[in-house]
Amino acid sequence: MSELLDERTMAFAGILQAIGQVQHIARHGNSDNDSLAASLNTVLVTNPDSTSDVYADKTALNKGYQLIVNQLGDSKDKDVEITRYLVGILALERKLSRGNAMGLLAERINQVHRQLHHFSITDEQVIANFAGIYSDVISTLGPKIQISGNPEFLKQNQVQEKIRALLLSAMRSAVLWRQLGGKRRHLVFARKSILDIANKSLTL
């Protein structure tokens, strides 16, 4: 059970890692390329041997673990915006897992794999492709997630596409979290164990 909870917490950190970047880009209009690449790469790992295979960049994942500590810990500085994005992603994931869009999602991700023969994962064309997958396959499943931020940045096409690409990454981690048995009630009843794992992971 302990190993499963470790893996589940890793996937949950993956969700928050992506959501944290969404918030940063919406507010500041820029992104850290390494963190962006780390999140986008998780979308491409569709048949992992282990959860760890999905998150090759452990340094980037630390940002997700830190958000777990911030959001689930005893601090009064919980970020309601991060919580709102998380609730939206988990709601869309439920609809995805219950519908028949998984096949289309896999097909579209294969197109990105082919595209990467010619471009890097943070290239504009690739990000636009990820964004298109989110718009066409995920966003249509339920209510759109309303992103808050600086209106000057939010109206820029490149910012919009990075945000959608990162929401797709958050969705990928949400699917994995659910596959590992993740349920929203665990965030309440297993909160201390999840926090312990997150804190331990930050010191490794």
From Swiss-Prot:
HAMAP family: HflD_protein (MF_00695). The keyword Oxidoreductase does not apply. This is High frequency lysogenization protein HflD homolog. Gene3D superfamilies: HflD-like (1.10.3890.10). GO terms for cellular component: cytoplasm; plasma membrane. Belongs to the HflD family. It comes from the Bacteria. The gene is hflD. It is found in: Cytoplasm; Cell inner membrane. It is a peripheral membrane protein. Keywords: Cell inner membrane, Cell membrane, Cytoplasm, Membrane. It comes from Shewanella woodyi (strain ATCC 51908 / MS32).
